[in-house]
């Protein structure tokens, strides 16, 4: 297995969570959350992050309904992924992110109660779950 560095984004219209991980260990950690204006981040911040970490792959969470069908936000997440590829030339993978926010909120609450549930922390923790889910799928 390659030791690729992978960044994951939890796309949202107001905030975009970010996590980083190593494929060889299959683990991820929260990095940050970017403010977004109707789904559009500060692209300079994104560029700085990508230059700093130089990921081999970027995983973008794909928000689906519980039955697996797409919702309006699904197309916006795909567009965000396409823009990442177009602007920065990074390889993209999409990952089902159903229930990642619910799981992230529960994990953070277990560690720090309501004080731990600020929006940025939840979004970055969701990105961790998205990336670890992607690792699990790759491992089979």
From Swiss-Prot:
GO terms, biological process: rRNA 5'-end processing
Free-text function comment from the UniProt entry: Could be a nuclease involved in processing of the 5'-end of pre-16S rRNA.
Pfam families according to UniProt: RuvX (PF03652)
Keywords: Cytoplasm, Hydrolase, Nuclease, Ribosome biogenesis
Family: Belongs to the YqgF nuclease family.
Keyword check for Cell inner membrane: no
Cellular localisation: Cytoplasm
GO cellular component: cytosol
Protein name: Putative pre-16S rRNA nuclease
């Amino acid at each position: 297995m390659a030791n690729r560095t992978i960044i994951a984004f939890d796309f949202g219209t107001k905030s975009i969570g970010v996590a980083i991980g190593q494929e060889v260990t299959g683990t991820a950690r929260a990095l940050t959350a970017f403010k977004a204006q109707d789904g559009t981040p500060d692209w300079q911040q994104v560029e700085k992050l990508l230059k700093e970490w130089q990921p081999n792959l970027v995983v973008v969470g794909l928000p689906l309904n519980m039955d697996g069908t797409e919702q309006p936000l699904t197309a916006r997440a795909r567009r965000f992924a396409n823009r990442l590829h177009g602007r920065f030339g990074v390889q993209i993978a999409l990952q089902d992110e159903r229930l990642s926010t619910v799981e992230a909120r529960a994990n953070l609450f277990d560690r720090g109660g309501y004080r731990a549930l600020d929006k940025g922390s939840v979004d970055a923790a969701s990105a961790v779950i998205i990336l670890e889910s992607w690792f699990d799928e790759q491992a089979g």
